[in-house]
Amino acid sequence: MSSKAARRRAREFALQGIYQWLLSANSMLLIEEHVSQVSGFDKADRELFISLLRGTLNNVDDLQAEFAPFIHRAVHELSPVERAILLLATHELKHNLDTPYRVIINEAIELAKSYGGTDGHRFVNGVLDKLATQLRVTEVSAGRS
């Protein structure tokens, strides 16, 4: 399996864990244990999964504060899937600087298409495009010139 596919799977499993946490408020370690037992997890990049899940869940309030200005409703009113995707992608934009912002946004859009509501991917795209201009100023500017 390619590393790209393994990374995509890691994001999918991290999304599942974040979603689970949003709905259950179970401990991060319990969720990590549960998700790692799901069929197909062996094909995911385990290190990336752990980094994404822990990094996101340890910083939920800060991450939400980053994207909140770009949504037109309270964060808790978002669907759990959209909220989980925004948390995950915001974490990556802030902390995984070796991953290009366009890759992060595209991966988030794909997650929203697979797991979100009908137009959830458009919403996610709009929020993350705006957020990227703040968190990745130099990279976004270079890409637009």
UniProtKB/Swiss-Prot annotation:
Keywords: RNA-binding, Transcription, Transcription antitermination, Transcription regulation. SUPFAM superfamilies: NusB-like. One of its GO terms (cellular component) is cytosol. GO terms for molecular function: RNA binding. GO terms for biological process: DNA-templated transcription termination; transcription antitermination. InterPro entries: NusB-like_sf (IPR035926), NusB_fam (IPR011605), NusB_RsmB_TIM44 (IPR006027). Pfam families: NusB. Involved in transcription antitermination. Required for transcription of ribosomal RNA (rRNA) genes. Binds specifically to the boxA antiterminator sequence of the ribosomal RNA (rrn) operons. Belongs to the NusB family. HAMAP family: NusB. This is Transcription antitermination protein NusB.
